[in-house]
Amino acid sequence: EIADTLEYIIAYPYWHVPNRIAVEEVLVKAKKDSTYLERNNFDILNSKREILDPKSIDWSKMTTNNFKYSVRQEGGSANSLGYVKFIFPNKYSIYLHDTPTKYYFSYESRAYSHGCVRVQHALDLADFLLENDENRYTLDSIKSFIDRRKERVISLNHKIPIYIYYMPTVADSLGNIIFYEDVYGLDNKLIQRLVSYGKQ
């Protein structure tokens, strides 16, 4: 459960790859394919946030334990966050974002994200938020930043409450119980806690 406020929009965002994804996915693919990083517009950064030449790294010696670099994906059409993301600062580093993989929205089950929330019509959402925010920036502004390939943070004048709940079981307006797929596997944990509590 997250209850927070949507505070700003980032146009043409970088994707700062979480460490777990960097070592479990990007590192594995980079070791297998020397062109992977360049083809997918990934930068490797040191602790000073300086971009390194991937060829200067001995990838054969890199492991999940000694990979001490940061990974960042350049903005653009292939960026995993698409052209825009929506930030509501929270301890889980979860946000809403555009996506280049629009075909996922045609699937009945769409839980393919690493944890953040993909938005099907992200530019439309940005347009709606800015228009109702009476913001000096507009959808045309965002498109201009995209065309110029420039990351830009756009603060909202009016912060918007946002609530995210995970409820694989709900009741409809008629009182019927509806069960959805427990994509995060939390039902079993809850059942185990209830059983343990009942034995006390």
Regions picked out by a protein language model, each given a short descriptive name:
Residues 1-200:
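Well-ordered beta-sheet/strand-loop patches within structured domains
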